[in-house]
């Protein structure tokens, strides 16, 4: 395929499909992480394209923290039923038993128990030797220096100082028993690329990405949506109805919305063209050193 004849987005699409097919051919037991967000929706769309008209030859895995937005879970189940892929859902049973909550245990401990430890449990349980993730290099500085094929040892840890060289499109997938590779087919995409591709390919997304009137409270400089009756208000907090949307989606008490009137994909793209801040600015788990992304990734987080 002559890359020079392809548009920018078609070049990114071709690169991602090549990576997805390469992993499917090279590894014995791959899995695709499905976080239900916009990047996961694009990655799922690319996987469906990569193997069309056949089915996706590997399962999708959602590590459920029990604190995702209700609209996310509804969208997940509806999407799995619509496309007929194998969906695995894992919750950390120890975390559920202890009632792990971002309100009681804090963002760092909640993320470690329900996301990092939950992910490692699922990878061990099913014996996956490769796991696709939707992370992009433009999101955050530790992700910017990570390889497309990111090696993990038998404890699922990452050493950023000991990464394998990647020359052009030659990826090293050699692993010993118990080791694995995290694979990031969207590494070279930007947030704007994602939204333009969603628009052009008519990809379904969680409605929370589009602006609407929603109940929110202002906390630590973020607008937190009140998604269910588990939301614990702090003294002086008042629930307000505001027109907001989300640039990134995670556990609802730890994910900040932005005030916006962009209720269409074209409106979102117009906002992205003038945006000067990272989408992960709305993630509470990224705001303190103890919860930094690189530290979490070293411990096994995606």
Swiss-Prot record:
EC number: 2.7.7.4
Signal peptide range in chain numbering: none
Assembly and oligomerization: Heterodimer composed of CysD, the smaller subunit, and CysN.
Function: With CysN forms the ATP sulfurylase (ATPS) that catalyzes the adenylation of sulfate producing adenosine 5'-phosphosulfate (APS) and diphosphate, the first enzymatic step in sulfur assimilation pathway. APS synthesis involves the formation of a high-energy phosphoric-sulfuric acid anhydride bond driven by GTP hydrolysis by CysN coupled to ATP hydrolysis by CysD.
GO terms of biological process kind: hydrogen sulfide biosynthetic process; sulfate assimilation
Record's keyword annotation contains ATP-binding: yes
Region entry Disordered, spans: 280-302
Protein name as it appears in the record: Sulfate adenylyltransferase subunit 2
GO molecular function, a single term: sulfate adenylyltransferase (ATP) activity
The keyword Transferase appears for this protein: yes
Entry-linked SUPFAM superfamilies: Adenine nucleotide alpha hydrolases-like (SSF52402)
Reactions accelerated catalytically: sulfate + ATP + H(+) = adenosine 5'-phosphosulfate + diphosphate
Family: Belongs to the PAPS reductase family. CysD subfamily.
């Amino acid at each position: 395929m002559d890359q020079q004849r392809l548009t920018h987005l078609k070049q990114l699409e071709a690169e991602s499909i090549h990576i997805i097919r390469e992993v499917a051919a090279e590894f014995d037991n791959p899995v695709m992480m499905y976080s239900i967000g916009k990047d996961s929706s694009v990655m799922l769309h690319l996987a469906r394209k990569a193997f069309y008209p056949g089915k996706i030859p590997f399962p999708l895995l959602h590590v459920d923290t029990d604190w995702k937005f209700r609209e996310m879970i509804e969208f997940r189940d509806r999407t799995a039923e619509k496309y007929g892929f194998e969906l695995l859902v894992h919750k950390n049973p120890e975390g559920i038993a202890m009632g792990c909550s971002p309100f009681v245990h804090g963002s760092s401990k909640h993320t470690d128990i329900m996301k990092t430890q939950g992910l490692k449990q699922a990878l061990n349980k099913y014996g996956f030797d490769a796991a696709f993730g939707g992370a992009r290099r433009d999101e955050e500085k530790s992700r910017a220096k990570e390889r497309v094929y990111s090696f993990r040892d038998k404890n699922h840890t990452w050493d950023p100082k000991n990464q394998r060289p990647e020359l052009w499109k030659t990826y090293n997938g050699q692993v010993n028993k118990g080791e694995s590779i995290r694979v990031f087919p969207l590494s070279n995409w930007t947030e704007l690329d994602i939204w333009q591709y969603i628009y052009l390919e008519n990809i379904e997304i969680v409605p929370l990405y589009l602006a609407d009137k929603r109940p929110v409270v202002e906390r630590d400089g973020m607008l937190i949506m009140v998604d269910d009756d588990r939301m614990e208000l702090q003294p002086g907090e008042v629930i307000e109805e505001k027109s907001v949307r989300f640039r990134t989606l995670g556990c609802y008490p730890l994910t900040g919305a932005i005030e916006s009137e962009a209720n269409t994909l074209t409106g979102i793209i117009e906002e992205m063209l003038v945006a000067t801040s990272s989408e992960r600015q709305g993630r509470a788990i990224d705001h303190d050193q103890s919860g930094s992304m690189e530290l979490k990734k070293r411990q096994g987080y995606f």
